[in-house]
Amino acid sequence: KTWTHFVAWAKANPGKLSYGSTGTMTSPHLTMELIAQKLGLELLHVPYKGSADLMQSILGGQIMAAADSTGFAPQVEAGKLRVLNTWGAERLAKFPDAPTLKELGLDLVQNSPFGIGAPKGTPEAVVKRLHDAFKQAMEQDSYKTALARYDMVPMYMSTSAYKKFAQDTFTREKALVEKLGLAKPT
């Protein structure tokens, strides 16, 4: 019923609480594993090929919980699912009663911003032109409206901030993938 119930049940039943994600090594999967590590939980991960398969399984009762970033709002609004927490820095306007991980005592914010890259060696003038065009597009009301449909919050980052974010995310997730034994031998 609540995140507190989820954690208590998982602790009392190690390895029995099944949760689905949109696939192995996706952000939802890795974030759930990080949460489990921080809380000392042993969860049963069930990977799916995307949100549609995941949604069918949670609604059909094949899994007990689901970690996904979008697509669940209609089911929550219909009373078929509930949001136990959100992973952003702030609560979602659509689900104001769902606490963030930080509010639940986990020092963790997981966002999956979209970015655009260019080949190494691309002239700075071209990088700046692309950056400025995408920044301008992100400021458009139509962009913000499109994100809101999926309960996503605009998250602008400068070129250098996004580069640092991507590097930090790669480092953190690489360590987690190795710890989980998911890294393929090279």
Describe these PLM feature segments.
Residues 34-38, 52-63, 73-80, 166:
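Short helices/loops that flank or line small-molecule/ion binding pockets
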Residues 48, 67-68, 86, 157:
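Short beta-strand and adjacent tight-turn residues that come in two discontinuous sequence segments
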Residues 3, 51-52, 69-70, 95, ...:
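Structural motif corresponding to alpha-helix initiation and N-cap regions
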Residues 1-53, 101, 106, 111-146:
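Hinge/capping helix and adjacent helix->loop/strand transition within the periplasmic-binding protein
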Residues 41-42, 76-86, 93-104, 174:
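Ligand-binding "clamshell"
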Residues 13-17, 39-41, 59-66, 80-83, ...:
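Alpha-to-beta junction loops
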Residues 69-71, 88, 120:
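Short secondary-structure boundary segments
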Residues 38-41, 77, 124-186:
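An extracytoplasmic/periplasmic, membrane-proximal ligand-sensing/linker region
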